[in-house]
């Protein structure tokens, strides 16, 4: 029997819609993940345009001449008195081998860690959101000076300076008082008063005698000047004699 006869059917005469063949699976490279990772590594955020907000440089920090040049390290002076390092051991010297120690380093280290004092972290402060850290102690944020015992106390050198100034002022005042006492008024004794009075009278007599010896006619300028001078001297001497005779007690400046 013909095998094609079994496939014959009346329904095969009905025209059927053509079906498109299924598409093959989409190609996916096996290196896709590797390529993505390489691209992410090569990229950097804000690399071409820079960060959004940047601190503006201060005009005081301008670029100075030779500031970009490399500076040599400070020169060290060679000291010949410094002892030399120990010599390198010879090739023939062999170190002692086989020495062993019975110390248990594991237990020793564990005991040192348990009994030791924990290391305190260094105090710092952060001033930006990006995490810039600085030492806290030299920043001035810690009230270090107001907690000192000698805070608000006058320094010792100022107290010493004030004492020296006070002592110098006292010495100066004492010197002035001594000079005032030396220059104080002293009283004339009766003998001294009488001697002064007699001396003034004697001077008056001499001036009066000279005045009496003048010519009768004063017909020249020198004669007039001489007469006026003698009259003034006699008048001053008479005034002094009158004061001394009037006052029995007289004080004079002590210039000794």
Curated annotation (Swiss-Prot):
Annotated signal sequence range: none
UniProt cross-references to InterPro entries, sorted A to Z: Enkurin_dom, Enkurin_domain-protein
Domain Enkurin: 160-252
Residue ranges, annotated region (Interaction with TRPC proteins): 160-255
Origin: domain of life: Eukaryota
Tissues in which the UniProt entry reports expression: Expressed in airway epithelial cells.
UniProt-annotated location(s): Cytoplasm, Cytoskeleton, Cilium axoneme; Cytoplasm, Cytoskeleton, Flagellum axoneme
Subunit: Microtubule inner protein component of sperm flagellar doublet microtubules. Binds calmodulin via its IQ domain. Interacts with TRPC1, TRPC2, TRPC5, but not TRPC3. Interacts with CFAP45.
Name this polypeptide is given: Enkurin
Species whose genome carries this gene: Homo sapiens (Human)
Phylogenetic classification of the source organism: Eukaryota, Metazoa, Chordata, Craniata, Vertebrata
């Amino acid at each position: 029997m013909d095998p094609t006869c079994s496939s014959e059917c009346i329904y095969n005469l009905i025209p059927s819609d053509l079906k498109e063949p299924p598409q093959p699976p989409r190609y996916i490279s096996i290196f896709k993940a590797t390529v993505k990772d390489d691209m992410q590594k090569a990229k950097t955020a804000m690399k071409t345009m820079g960060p959004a907000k940047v601190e503006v440089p201060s005009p005081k920090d301008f670029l100075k001449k030779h500031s970009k040049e490399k500076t040599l390290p400070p020169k060290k002076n060679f000291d010949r008195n410094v002892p030399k390092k120990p010599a390198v051991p010879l090739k023939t010297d062999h170190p002692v081998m086989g020495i062993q120690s019975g110390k248990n380093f594991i237990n020793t280290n564990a005991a040192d860690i348990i009994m030791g004092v924990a290391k305190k972290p260094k105090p710092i402060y952060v001033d930006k959101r990006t995490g810039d850290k600085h030492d806290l102690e030299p920043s001035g944020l810690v009230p270090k000076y107001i907690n000192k015992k000698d805070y608000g106390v006058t320094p010792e050198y100022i107290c010493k300076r004030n004492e020296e100034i006070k002592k110098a002022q006292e010495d100066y005042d004492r010197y002035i008082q001594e000079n005032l006492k030396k220059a104080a008024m002293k009283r004339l004794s009766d003998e001294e008063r009488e001697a002064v009075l007699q001396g003034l009278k004697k001077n008056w007599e001499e001036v009066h005698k000279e005045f009496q010896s003048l010519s009768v006619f004063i017909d020249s300028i020198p004669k007039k000047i001489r007469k006026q001078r003698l009259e003034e001297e006699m008048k001053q001497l008479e005034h002094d004699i009158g004061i001394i005779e009037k006052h029995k007690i007289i004080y004079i400046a002590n210039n000794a």
